[in-house]
Structures are given as C-alpha cells and as structure tokens.
C-alpha cells in the first residue's frame, strides 16, 4: 500500500508541512504594505494548501505494516501480552464504533431520533462478540 511507504516518513512530512506553512507566513510578513484583505486571502490559501496536502497515516497501520515487513519480529508474544493486545484491539474497534455513532448522531435532527439510534446501537453492541 502507498500508506505503508509513508510510515517512516511521517515526521519528515510533518516537518515539511510545517516549514511550508512557515514559508507562507514569512511571505505574508514581507508584504506588510499590502491591504489587510490581501493578507486574509493569503492566509486562507495557506490553510487550504496545508489542509489539502497533509495526509495522516494511522500509527496502528504503521505498526501492523512494519510487523509484516520484518519477519524476525513475528514471534508470538507471551499469553499475558496476547491478552493485553486483545484488549487494545477491542478498545480500537469500540473507539471506531463510538466515532461512527457520534457522526451518525450529528446527522439526526430530533432528540427522539437520537435516542432511538442510541438504543438500537446499545442493543447491537450487547449482541456483539466483542463484549
């Protein structure tokens, strides 16, 4: 995957994005004689540039990919570590569920709809094999 190639370069990409935003800010400071509207426009363009060109790679994805790339690290962890890793995986899955639930709740307009969605999700989680 393309994201796996970026894992080792995450810090460098952050530094690059930060340096580009710093260059944009320096450019704004050098044009002090311009009107304030021009500064606002440049500031918005700078934010758009940073937002469009920055992509985040999940640290979880990076660690999983690095384990696949390095076969000598594929030694089975002791049972205590397996239980800990299993709990972490459950937390990650539940965290994603919570995020999706919050996004779904934000799309609903009435409190009744939100309550019904929460009750349905609670029932679904009660039947889930994760718990």
Swiss-Prot record:
InterPro entries: Taxilin_fam
Molecular function GO terms recorded: syntaxin binding
Tissue-specific expression: Ubiquitously expressed.
Superkingdom of origin organism: Eukaryota
Family affiliation: Belongs to the taxilin family.
Name under which the protein is recorded: Putative gamma-taxilin 2
Organism listed in the record: Homo sapiens
């Amino acid at each position: 995957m393309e994201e796996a190639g970026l894992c080792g370069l995450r810090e460098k990409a952050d530094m690059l994005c930060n340096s580009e935003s710093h260059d944009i800010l320096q450019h704004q400071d050098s044009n002090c004689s311009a009107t304030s509207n021009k500064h606002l426009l440049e500031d918005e363009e700078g934010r758009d540039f940073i937002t469009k060109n920055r992509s985040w790679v999940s640290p979880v994805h990076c660690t999983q990919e690095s384990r696949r790339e390095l076969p000598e690290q594929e030694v089975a962890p002791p049972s205590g570590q397996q239980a800990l890793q299993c709990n972490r995986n459950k937390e990650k899955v539940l965290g994603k569920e919570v995020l999706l639930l919050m996004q779904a709740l934000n799309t609903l307009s009435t409190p009744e709809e939100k309550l019904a969605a929460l009750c349905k999700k609670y029932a679904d989680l009660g039947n889930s094999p994760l718990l």
